[in-house]
């Protein structure tokens, strides 16, 4: 009888441990983003947050979209409820308010833009490997300079 009671006690303790871990994981992570380098106090900073290289490269959807009114030189927002993991951000300062990255006739961007980790691209967006950063459980911060 004591062995059965011990087994049920062990199972109950294991379930309680698993449940508390699941609750902690459900709490997720938050990401406090700061955008700096804005010269003009007009339009909005637009961005997208990706959780995979495929999505980042156009083979999937972003997990979050960001839009912050550009009313000062430094802007901040908090993205809550994220799963811990690896993420990357593409962003730009939408000066003309059309919600699109404006470009010249040759396809070169004419609005300021940036990637997470302040990564730079060569004739295109920064590579996932350069732009990706880790979001850990709890509070995280990341700063991007728009140029």
Located regions from the model:
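Extracellular beta-sheet/turn segments enriched in Thr/Pro/Gly and aliphatic residues
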Residues: 112-147
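A glycine-anchored, Pro-Gly-centered beta-turn/N-cap motif
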Residues: 73, 78, 82-86, 138
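Bacterial N-terminal signal peptides
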Residues: 10-19
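A short, amphipathic beta-strand motif
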Residues: 31-37, 47, 144
């Amino acid at each position: 009888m004591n062995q059965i009671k011990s087994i049920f006690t062990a199972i109950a303790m294991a379930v309680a441990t698993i449940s508390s871990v699941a609750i902690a994981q459900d709490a997720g992570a938050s990401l406090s983003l700061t955008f700096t380098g804005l010269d003009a106090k007009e339009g909005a900073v637009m961005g997208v947050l990706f959780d995979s290289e495929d999505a980042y490269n156009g083979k999937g959807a972003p997990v979050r979209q960001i839009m912050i009114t550009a009313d000062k030189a430094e802007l901040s927002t908090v993205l809550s409820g994220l799963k811990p993991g690896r993420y990357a951000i593409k962003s730009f300062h939408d000066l003309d308010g059309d919600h699109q990255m404006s470009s010249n006739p040759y396809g070169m961007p004419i609005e300021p833009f940036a990637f997470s980790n302040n990564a730079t691209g060569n004739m295109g967006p920064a590579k996932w490997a350069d732009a990706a950063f880790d979001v850990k459980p709890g509070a995280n911060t990341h700063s991007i300079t728009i140029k």
